[in-house]
From Swiss-Prot:
NCBIfam families: rplP_bact (TIGR01164). The keyword tRNA-binding applies. InterPro entries: Ribosomal_uL16, Ribosomal_uL16_bact-type, Ribosomal_uL16_CS, Ribosomal_uL16_dom, Ribosomal_uL16_sf. Binds 23S rRNA and is also seen to make contacts with the A and possibly P site tRNAs. The lineage of its organism: Bacteria, Pseudomonadati, Pseudomonadota, Gammaproteobacteria, Enterobacterales. This is Large ribosomal subunit protein uL16. Keywords: Ribonucleoprotein, Ribosomal protein, RNA-binding, rRNA-binding, tRNA-binding. Belongs to the universal ribosomal protein uL16 family.
């Protein structure tokens, strides 16, 4: 699963997920899966969607993952009282703003790409849409 090799700090503040996204254009492939809603994707969800897409296209074409889980989320163990410091890092998330391209695909027909992205979108907790590369 995806996670940073090393970080400057082990734990981070919760923060907010506001604003609009960077990386809103399909830049590597021909087709893309773009976030319509706002939220956070865990490394497991990103991997599950990638596997669903890869199986749908039967390992042909090329897939790019445009998001990376770089924020650690901490949790305290079960039945532990409040206080006594921040919990341990349990998983990593990527913060997603509307307009962010999550995945890209190339080398497959459009119908197959749509089908694959639909299977991937079912694994994700945010609303998404299918986009194609705009030629200027």
């Amino acid at each position: 699963m995806l996670q940073p090799k090393r970080t400057k700090f082990r734990k981070v503040h919760k923060g907010r997920n506001r604003g609009l996204a960077q990386g809103t254009d399909v830049s590597f492939g021909t087709f893309g899966l773009k976030a319509v809603g706002r939220g956070r994707l865990t490394a497991r969800q990103i991997e599950a969607a990638r596997r669903a897409m890869t199986r749908a296209v039967k390992r042909q074409g090329k897939i790019w993952i445009r998001v990376f889980p770089d924020k650690p989320i901490t949790e305290k163990p079960l039945e532990v009282r409040m206080g006594k410091g921040k919990g341990n890092v349990e998983y990593w998330v990527a913060l997603i703003q509307p307009g962010k391209v999550l995945y890209e695909m190339d080398g497959v027909p459009e119908e197959l790409a749509r089908e694959a992205f639909q299977l991937a979108a079912a694994k994700l907790p945010i609303k998404t849409t299918f986009v194609t590369k705009t030629v200027m």
